[in-house]
């Protein structure tokens, strides 16, 4: 017994997007029912019956082609329920199956005349024009029935292959050919529209043309050589993918599944429908009209006009507005074509496939966290409890604080102190990843150790801002939690912010202080013009250590830019321009004092340094003390 819902695994090496042949397009939409009937071609422009509200047969929502609109129920209602699975109703021809097949079953429209694919004709570059080695304007003249093109010059001496002729020119040549005194036996052949374009593309022998181009490239240079290389590259790609150039001219158009272009009933009884249905309807109407005109052998000028209108309808379906007038619906709003659905920021790829929401992630506004270490970020408690919930629940149960998941969730909702303590244990050593869109290089996403903070904003260390190109004027960042041990290890080893000091693009440091930090450092170390320098020994301005200066500043006994004498026995880089001290004095105990502009040294009898006082400002002491502390802690 087999289960039709079982998923089968298909292993493949790669996914390739290439041109589809007309046969392949028909394969997508064509199915043979168990009774031998072949279905798949959409021939009617109708969507649903306005009285029964059921899809019309052979229309754009046909249940025979695309599958039933209700689970396990045929169109006429003869078969209902799952027990009739797989049966094809002999009355309506609908297969009894799930309605979700309407999300992937396709149909097709067989065109009464070939039409050019607007992407390859009007794209940049125009592949049709490159392959035919003709100007795009000339190709457009042929496709849109403005000019004839010579497909075979025959015995006519003035005509050349691929030469363009206007209506009047061709009429003159026709008169010449069919004149009694004409000596032309092998008549020239001309064509117009996408049929002529298809003929030109079919006549191309890609391997021969490629060989000929290679020979020409060897003997040419400059712009001509670049043009030849461009054409050769396109031809080589066609050969490599086994695609034929004439496939750029469509004989069959695929109809996408109906559930991807739905029609829904609104409260007032009116219907809202996808724009694609209107565009498909235009194509089917014009195609059917053209087929009827061809059947009744209508005048060539009428048939040609209908072919041009069919070409424009297919252009609008594939890429509305790419050429000619944009097709508009109600309120003069341009209809969304297949290209509009796929491309752009709101398109299928960027919005729905690449822009999917993922579990264990969140986003919030960023604010500066100056007290954080570089590898840390502030994570709001409210966010952390949600992101790390499975880990918290697991630990609560393991520590016998609760017995089951339901009780754990209730406890978490109350945000008890116990829960916060467990959360702190969970996040300790568990890195999280921060991402700021747009992620233009690999440093746009980095790992940090989370620190629980109050409020609802993520705190970010100011030094990592250049890597993210972030500022604090309302920027938002996304948080992701790596779950597996391997992911956590990778995040810690490779992605931790403190391990990404250099830019991968230039090799230069990307962690550089800027803006507030530079301004703060400047303000801290700036000298106040005209500030009075104290004499050494002034009790209010002489201190025995850096800590004493900081304590005095905190007690507001001295200002940030006041000059102070402070004892400092470390190395000092002195830019004193004097060759000799301002004052040198030997004391009664044999020690010697040297007074310089910004320092005062005391040496013993052997010349060894006993003590050193330096003249500096409070701000510079604070800066120095902070740096020494940071280096010592590292």
From Swiss-Prot:
<keyword id="KW-0548">Nucleotidyltransferase</keyword>
<keyword id="KW-0808">Transferase</keyword>
<keyword id="KW-0479">Metal-binding</keyword>
<dbReference type="InterPro" id="IPR044893">
    <property type="entry name" value="RNA_pol_Rpb1_clamp_domain"/>
</dbReference>
<keyword id="KW-0460">Magnesium</keyword>
<dbReference type="InterPro" id="IPR006592">
    <property type="entry name" value="RNA_pol_N"/>
</dbReference>
<dbReference type="InterPro" id="IPR007080">
    <property type="entry name" value="RNA_pol_Rpb1_1"/>
</dbReference>
<dbReference type="InterPro" id="IPR007066">
    <property type="entry name" value="RNA_pol_Rpb1_3"/>
</dbReference>
<dbReference type="GO" id="GO:0008270">
    <property type="term" value="F:zinc ion binding"/>
</dbReference>
<comment type="function">
    <text>DNA-dependent RNA polymerase catalyzes the transcription of DNA into RNA using the four ribonucleoside triphosphates as substrates.</text>
</comment>
<keyword id="KW-0240">DNA-directed RNA polymerase</keyword>
<feature type="binding site">
    <location>
        <position position="74"/>
    </location>
    <ligand>
        <name>Zn(2+)</name>
    </ligand>
</feature>
<feature type="binding site">
    <location>
        <position position="76"/>
    </location>
    <ligand>
        <name>Zn(2+)</name>
    </ligand>
</feature>
<dbReference type="Pfam" id="PF00623">
    <property type="entry name" value="RNA_pol_Rpb1_2"/>
</dbReference>
<dbReference type="InterPro" id="IPR042102">
    <property type="entry name" value="RNA_pol_Rpb1_3_sf"/>
</dbReference>
<feature type="binding site">
    <location>
        <position position="471"/>
    </location>
    <ligand>
        <name>Mg(2+)</name>
    </ligand>
</feature>
<dbReference type="InterPro" id="IPR000722">
    <property type="entry name" value="RNA_pol_asu"/>
</dbReference>
<feature type="binding site">
    <location>
        <position position="473"/>
    </location>
    <ligand>
        <name>Mg(2+)</name>
    </ligand>
</feature>
<dbReference type="Pfam" id="PF04983">
    <property type="entry name" value="RNA_pol_Rpb1_3"/>
</dbReference>
<keyword id="KW-0804">Transcription</keyword>
<dbReference type="GO" id="GO:0006351">
    <property type="term" value="P:DNA-templated transcription"/>
</dbReference>
<dbReference type="InterPro" id="IPR034678">
    <property type="entry name" value="RNApol_RpoC1"/>
</dbReference>
<dbReference type="GO" id="GO:0003677">
    <property type="term" value="F:DNA binding"/>
</dbReference>
<dbReference type="GO" id="GO:0000428">
    <property type="term" value="C:DNA-directed RNA polymerase complex"/>
</dbReference>
<comment type="similarity">
    <text>Belongs to the RNA polymerase beta' chain family. RpoC1 subfamily.</text>
</comment>
<dbReference type="Pfam" id="PF04997">
    <property type="entry name" value="RNA_pol_Rpb1_1"/>
</dbReference>
<protein>
    <recommendedName>
        <fullName>DNA-directed RNA polymerase subunit gamma</fullName>
        <ecNumber>2.7.7.6</ecNumber>
    </recommendedName>
</protein>
<feature type="binding site">
    <location>
        <position position="92"/>
    </location>
    <ligand>
        <name>Zn(2+)</name>
    </ligand>
</feature>
<feature type="binding site">
    <location>
        <position position="89"/>
    </location>
    <ligand>
        <name>Zn(2+)</name>
    </ligand>
</feature>
<dbReference type="InterPro" id="IPR012755">
    <property type="entry name" value="DNA-dir_RpoC1_gamma"/>
</dbReference>
<keyword id="KW-0862">Zinc</keyword>
<comment type="subunit">
    <text>In cyanobacteria the RNAP catalytic core is composed of 2 alpha, 1 beta, 1 beta', 1 gamma and 1 omega subunit. When a sigma factor is associated with the core the holoenzyme is formed, which can initiate transcription.</text>
</comment>
<dbReference type="GO" id="GO:0000287">
    <property type="term" value="F:magnesium ion binding"/>
</dbReference>
<feature type="binding site">
    <location>
        <position position="475"/>
    </location>
    <ligand>
        <name>Mg(2+)</name>
    </ligand>
</feature>
<dbReference type="InterPro" id="IPR045867">
    <property type="entry name" value="DNA-dir_RpoC_beta_prime"/>
</dbReference>
<dbReference type="GO" id="GO:0003899">
    <property type="term" value="F:DNA-directed RNA polymerase activity"/>
</dbReference>
């Amino acid at each position: 017994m087999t289960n039709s819902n079982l998923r089968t695994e298909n292993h493949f090496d790669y996914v390739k997007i290439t041109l589809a042949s007309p046969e392949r397009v028909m394969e997508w939409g064509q199915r043979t029912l168990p009774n031998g009937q072949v279905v798949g071609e959409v021939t009617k422009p109708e969507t649903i019956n306005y009285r029964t509200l059921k899809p019309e047969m052979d229309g754009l929502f046909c249940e025979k082609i695309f599958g039933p609109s209700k689970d396990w129920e045929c169109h006429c209602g003869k078969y209902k329920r799952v027990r009739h699975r797989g049966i094809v109703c002999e009355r309506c021809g609908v297969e009894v199956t799930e309605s979700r097949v309407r999300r992937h079953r396709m149909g097709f429209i067989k065109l009464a005349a070939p039409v050019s694919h607007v992407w390859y004709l009007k794209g940049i570059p125009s592949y049709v024009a490159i392959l035919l080695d003709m100007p795009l304007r000339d190709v457009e003249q042929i496709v849109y029935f403005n000019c004839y093109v010579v497909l075979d010059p025959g015995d006519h001496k003035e005509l050349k292959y691929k030469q363009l002729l206007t209506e009047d020119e061709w009429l003159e040549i026709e008169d010449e050919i069919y004149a009694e005194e004409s000596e032309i036996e092998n008549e020239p052949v001309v064509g117009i529209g996408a049929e002529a374009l298809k003929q030109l593309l079919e006549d191309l022998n890609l391997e021969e043309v490629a060989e000929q181009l290679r020979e020409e490239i060897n003997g040419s240079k400059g712009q001509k050589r670049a043009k030849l290389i461009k054409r050769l590259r396109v031809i080589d790609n066609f050969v490599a993918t086994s695609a034929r150039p004439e496939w750029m001219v469509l004989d069959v158009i695929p109809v996408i599944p109906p559930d991807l272009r739905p029609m829904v009933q609104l409260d007032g009884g009116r219907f809202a429908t996808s724009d694609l249905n209107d565009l498909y309807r235009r194509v089917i109407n014009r195609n059917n009209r053209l087929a009827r005109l061809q059947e009744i052998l209508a005048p060539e000028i009428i048939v040609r006009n209908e072919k041009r209108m069919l070409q424009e309808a297919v252009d609008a379906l594939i890429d509305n507005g790419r050429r000619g007038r944009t097709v508009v619906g109600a309120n003069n709003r341009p209809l969304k074509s297949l290209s509009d659905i796929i491309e752009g920021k709101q398109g299928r790829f960027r919005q729905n496939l690449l822009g999917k929401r993922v579990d264990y992630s969140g986003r919030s506004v960023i604010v500066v966290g100056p007290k954080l270490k570089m590898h840390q970020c502030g994570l709001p408690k409210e966010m952390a409890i949600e992101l790390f919930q499975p880990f918290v629940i697991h630990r609560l149960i393991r520590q016998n604080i609760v017995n089951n998941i339901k009780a754990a969730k209730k406890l978490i909702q109350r945000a008890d102190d116990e829960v916060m303590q467990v959360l702190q244990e969970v996040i300790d050593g568990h890195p999280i990843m921060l991402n700021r869109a747009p992620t233009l290089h690999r440093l746009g996403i980095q790992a940090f150790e989370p620190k629980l903070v109050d409020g609802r904003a993520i705190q970010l260390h100011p030094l990592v801002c250049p890597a993210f190109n972030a500022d604090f004027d309302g920027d938002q960042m996304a948080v992701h939690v790596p779950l597996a041990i391997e992911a956590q290890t990778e995040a810690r080893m490779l992605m931790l912010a403190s391990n990404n000091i250099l830019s991968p693009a230039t090799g230069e440091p990307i962690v550089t202080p800027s803006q507030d930090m530079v301004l703060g450092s400047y303000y801290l170390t700036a000298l106040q013009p005209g500030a009075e320098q104290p004499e050494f020994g002034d009790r209010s301005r002489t201190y025995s250590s850096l800590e004493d200066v900081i304590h005095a500043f905190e007690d507001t006994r001295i200002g940030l830019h006041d000059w102070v004498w402070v004892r400092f026995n470390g190395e000092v880089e002195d830019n004193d321009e004097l060759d000799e001290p301002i004052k040198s004095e030997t004391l009664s105990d044999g020690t010697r004092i040297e007074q310089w502009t910004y320092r005062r040294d005391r040496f013993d009898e052997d010349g060894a340094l006993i003590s050193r006082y330096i003249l500096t400002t409070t701000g510079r002491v604070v800066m120095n003390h902070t740096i020494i502390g940071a280096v010592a802690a590292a």
